Amino acid sequence: MDPYKHRPSSAFNAPYWTTNSGAPVWNNDSSLTVGARGPILLEDYHCEKLANFDRERIPERVVHARGASAKGFFEVTHDITHLTCADFLRAPGVQTPVIVRFSTVIHERGSPETLRDPRGFAVKFYTREGNWDLVGNNFPVFFIRDGIKFPDMVHALKPNPRTHIQDNWRILDFFSHHPESLHMFSFLFDDVGIPADYRHMDGSGVHTYTLVSRAGTVTYVKFHWRPTCGVRSLMDDEAVRCGANHSHATKDLTDAIAAGNFPEWTLYIQTMDPEMEDRLDDLDPLDVTKTWPEDTFPLQPVGRLVLNRNIDNFFAENEQLAFCPGLIVPGIYYSDDKLLQTRIFSYSDTQRHRLGPNYLLLPANAPKCAHHNNHYDGSMNFMHRHEEVDYFPSRYDAVRNAPRYPIPTAHIAGRREKTVISKENNFKQPGERYRAMDPARQERFITRWVDALSDPRLTHEIRTIWLSNWSQADRSLGQKLASRLSAKPSM
């Protein structure tokens, strides 16, 4: 027991074996029985040992179950105080401790790290004004734009509930109803669809967020991570060979940090004045299935992320590590992106299910700054408290509201309605991305799609929809796919 932190710690281990309650165990090799051959007694430590073992595992994440974490710091390199009042971005040279979790998305905790699958890239900043979670992926876009479809999307991507095998026909059936997914698939089926490891991988906040300055000026922002060592991906045959070690990316990250070869990323932002939104003919800046063109909205450097420490315990700092896009700090705010709004609720909700209502008290998730509220008790609450006043306000407790900080104050009015955005434009950016590939890369992209569309359970109707969608993105792409599939593209 650490007497200063009021919680168990292996740094204060007893020199001999004990029970969970601290009683000495004089024999941890044999069960207590009635005679040498008799039955085991319920009073034996054996029962506590088994009961604890039976409860070691917790529910795995419904997505991003397979992951690896590391610790380090974020250092500001460029002044953006004209855009945000965020304290941890207050000046170049300021460093903030972080923990980062990389992950695959769809498959289980023990699945290979060589699957064609998006990768999670989540960063927790332990700032002086609370924790900020930037919870993103390696691709800058997503499959869907409305969070109400998220459970259906995950079900379609997950293994078949009857056979527990991931089926292309299920995936292509679902996304045939969602042509906005084409842009994401232009990344996933491209050469970048299987990152070589976590160190050579881009990251993106994916959503549009909001920066708020000290004066209250609001700016739309997108966040991007770029590895200083460059991006590397696995070709399909390389992934098969690499799959002999199903934890290759975790091992690469751990070994690199242990050897002092610290991974590093540069944080860039793209910014947009919200008043410019109405002047964009074919782009909704809150559409998570689109990127902002860099020639119009250039990348601006902000700082660097360095991972220089491996985690001390996988369960405590990876499995119990919890991220939520709803965790923000003054100077950074949400946008009205429908998928982001969904994630703000869903992520904290799933952590309470997975880890319990007091998951933010766990060391990896707790803020490193002083904090104070009246959120009391609940399952597994181990915070040491001795206050007599558990309400607010009170003349017996001097605690007060924090100093006011600016938040967006846009006026919003409208009718209750369920609708899609007006600027869908689902085909332009996927087509541009395909045409930017060199011929050999295009050929590999086509080969992967022919393989997916050749699933014997895929109906002619669904295959025709996909040929039509890709033809609308790029006519020659649709024709090549149709030719390989001995079908005619439908326009």
Curated annotation (Swiss-Prot):
InterPro entries: Catalase (IPR018028), Catalase_AS (IPR024708), Catalase_clade1/3 (IPR024711), Catalase_core (IPR011614), Catalase_haem_BS (IPR002226), Catalase_immune_responsive (IPR010582), Catalase_sf (IPR020835). It catalyses: 2 H2O2 = O2 + 2 H2O. Signal peptide: none annotated. Catalyzes the degradation of hydrogen peroxide (H(2)O(2)) generated by peroxisomal oxidases to water and oxygen, thereby protecting cells from the toxic effects of hydrogen peroxide. This is Catalase isozyme 2. The lineage of its organism: Eukaryota, Viridiplantae, Streptophyta, Embryophyta, Tracheophyta. Belongs to the catalase family. Keywords: Cytoplasm, Heme, Hydrogen peroxide, Iron, Metal-binding, Oxidoreductase, Peroxidase, Peroxisome. Homotetramer. GO terms for cellular component: cytoplasm; cytosol; peroxisomal matrix; peroxisome; plasma membrane. It comes from Zea mays (Maize). GO terms for biological process: hydrogen peroxide catabolic process; response to auxin; response to hydrogen peroxide; response to light stimulus; response to reactive oxygen species; response to xenobiotic stimulus. Its EC number is 1.11.1.6. One of its GO terms (molecular function) is metal ion binding. Its main location: cytoplasm.
